[in-house]
């Protein structure tokens, strides 16, 4: 008899697609993915990027799914908006009669309400969430309260799937033993990006010419939301520390993304490296590869909230160097100081500048590859193992 697995997710997310496809492909599994809303399928406003867009590749292809609502993404965070959507999601999952429910994240309100409804109904629950103790700094009182709340929350779940080393340490600190954990490091759709590598890497020099970037220039690439938690303004501050360094004359900054700090970032870059930066705005999935292909080093100076940083996976698949702050979760798993990686102290422009100077001596990138990178199938395998170990009629 097939095992039935339900997954609960806020909205369609590109990075989850290969996970659900892998689970659905197993002949011993019947899968249903329940989304709170359809954000990203149709053009809609994204509050973080500050632009209106729809994904240019289908994030729900290749597996069964349903939607609890067609409400805007923001409705999932408000109590009044999330409650009716949660009831609908819980009803859809209950009707599916799963053996277990894999819950992605522990927020927003929609996820919390639905999880509580499912727990009340006696469902077996598993958790895959962006958990860490390093992404945010909290006062003693806030930290104490958070720990108490999370300990009780994690008690609802039979098993958890940490996204990385720091995530696993977080669970251990809060009393979840290793036997209730299955580590599967956060992964991107490596097959999708392998196709991007094959498409764009041979065009590297042409792509650079289109942006008037010389072959000998060293391109620093920023990809993502241009928001305070990402601390993008630390980049021009770091470059200012290199004013007397002749290597600054070979640096070009390419910024891919949008957000509330875009204008400020572009203004400060122009002041420090006039004419040697390119603002590309928001780019959809199919176009990201062109910018990784022309770049040399990814920079990710986040100051808080960066539980992993999937752009690190993407950049390394293209063979780029990576410089990130110590607040980035993947720094421990993927970037620890090496020939092609540096980790700087969060918020420290001088330390960031030293990392840039150390890695900008060459415009050569490594051979693209995925051998050392996390793969979505690792999580698929861990989930399947747990499914097969479940006793009969445990849902």
Q: Model features per residue range: what roles?
A:
Residues 104, 108-110, 121-143, 156-159:
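A short, histidine- and acid-enriched strand-loop-helix "catalytic/donor-clamping" loop
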Residues 142-143, 150, 155-205:
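Donor nucleotide-sugar binding/catalytic pocket of nucleotide-sugar-dependent glycosyltransferases
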Residues 214-230, 236-239:
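Conserved donor-binding/catalytic core segment of Leloir-type glycosyltransferases
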Residues 263-283:
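Nucleotide-activated donor-binding/catalytic signature segment of Leloir-type glycosyltransferases, i.e.
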Residues 282-283, 291-295:
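Short alpha-helical donor nucleotide-sugar binding micro-motif in glycosyltransferases
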Residues 293-307, 320:
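Acidic donor-binding loop of glycosyltransferase active sites
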Residues 312, 321-325:
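Short hydrophobic beta-strand element within catalytic cores of glycosyltransferases
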Residues 343, 361-395:
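A charged, aromatic-enriched C-terminal amphipathic alpha-helix characteristic of glycosyltransferases
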């Amino acid at each position: 008899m097939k095992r039935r697995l339900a997954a609960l997710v806020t909205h369609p997310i590109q990075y989850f697609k290969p996970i659900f496809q892998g689970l659905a492909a197993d002949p011993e599994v019947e899968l249903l993915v329940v989304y709170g809303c359809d954000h990203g399928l149709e053009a809609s406003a994204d509050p973080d990027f500050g632009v209106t867009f729809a994904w240019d590749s289908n994030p729900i292809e290749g597996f069964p799914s349903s939607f609890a609502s067609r409400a805007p993404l923001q409705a999932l965070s408000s109590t009044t908006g999330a409650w009716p959507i949660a009831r609908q999601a819980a009803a859809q999952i209950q009707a599916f009669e799963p053996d277990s429910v894999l819950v992605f994240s522990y927020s927003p309100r929609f996820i919390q309400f639905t999880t509580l409804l499912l727990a009340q109904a006696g469902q077996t629950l598993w958790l895959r969430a962006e958990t860490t103790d390093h992404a945010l700094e909290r006062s003693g009182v806030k930290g104490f309260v958070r720990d108490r709340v999370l300990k009780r929350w994690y008690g609802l779940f039979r098993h958890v799937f940490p996204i990385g080393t720091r995530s696993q340490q977080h669970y251990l600190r809060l009393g979840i033993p290793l036997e209730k954990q299955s580590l599967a490091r956060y992964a991107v759709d490596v097959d999708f990006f392998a196709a991007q590598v094959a498409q764009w890497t041979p065009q590297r020099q042409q792509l650079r010419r289109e942006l008037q970037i010389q072959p000998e220039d060293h391109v620093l690439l920023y990809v993502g939301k241009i928001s305070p938690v990402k601390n993008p303004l630390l980049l021009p501050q770091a470059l200012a520390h290199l004013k007397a360094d002749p290597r600054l004359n070979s640096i070009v900054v390419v910024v891919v993304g949008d957000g509330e700090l875009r204008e400020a970032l572009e203004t400060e870059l122009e002041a420090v490296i006039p004419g040697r930066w390119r603002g590309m705005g928001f780019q959809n999935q199919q176009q990201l590869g062109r910018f990784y292909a022309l770049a040399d080093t990814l920079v990710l100076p986040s100051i808080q909230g960066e539980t992993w940083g999937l752009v690190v996976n993407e950049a390394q698949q293209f063979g780029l160097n990576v410089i990130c702050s110590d607040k980035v979760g993947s720094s421990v798993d993927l970037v620890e100081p090496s020939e092609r990686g540096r980790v700087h102290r969060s918020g420290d422009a001088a330390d960031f500048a030293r990392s840039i100077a150390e890695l900008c001596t060459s415009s050569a990138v490594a051979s693209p590859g995925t051998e050392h990178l996390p793969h979505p199938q690792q999580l698929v395998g861990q989930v399947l193992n747990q499914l097969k170990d479940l006793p009969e009629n445990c849902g």
